[in-house]
UniProtKB/Swiss-Prot annotation:
Lineage, opening ranks: Bacteria, Bacillati, Bacillota, Clostridia, Eubacteriales
Gene (name only): xseB
Compartments in which it is found: Cytoplasm
Residue runs in coiled coils: none
GO cellular component term of the entry, any: exodeoxyribonuclease VII complex
Cited InterPro entries: Exonuc_VII_S, Exonuc_VII_ssu_sf
GO MF annotations in UniProt: exodeoxyribonuclease VII activity
Summary of the function given for this chain in its UniProt record: Bidirectionally degrades single-stranded DNA into large acid-insoluble oligonucleotides, which are then degraded further into small acid-soluble oligonucleotides.
NCBIfam families linked to this entry: xseB
Protein name: Exodeoxyribonuclease 7 small subunit
Subunit comment: Heterooligomer composed of large and small subunits.
Family statement: Belongs to the XseB family.
């Protein structure tokens, strides 16, 4: 799979879902689109996991100083 941005991969995944939900694809094409959708889904999940690991938030502690804490979803 080519190197995609998260946003482009998500858009392509949404398009794949729409194609599959339309019911207009032949069986072989449906399987191909489904496989591509799985790859896109895994890519998006990986990108989100990596982003989650990088996110930190800044909070003010009781002493009035700022500290970095891991972001929790």
């Amino acid at each position: 799979m080519e190197k995609l941005s998260f946003e482009l991969a998500l858009k392509k995944l949404e398009e794949s879902v729409e194609q599959l939900e339309s019911g207009e694809l032949e069986l072989e094409e449906s399987i191909k689109v489904f496989e591509q959708g799985i790859e896109l889904s895994l890519f998006c999940r990986k990108e989100l996991s990596q982003a989650e690991g990088k996110i930190q938030r800044l909070v003010k502690n009781l002493g009035g100083e700022f500290e970095l804490l891991d972001f929790e979803v």
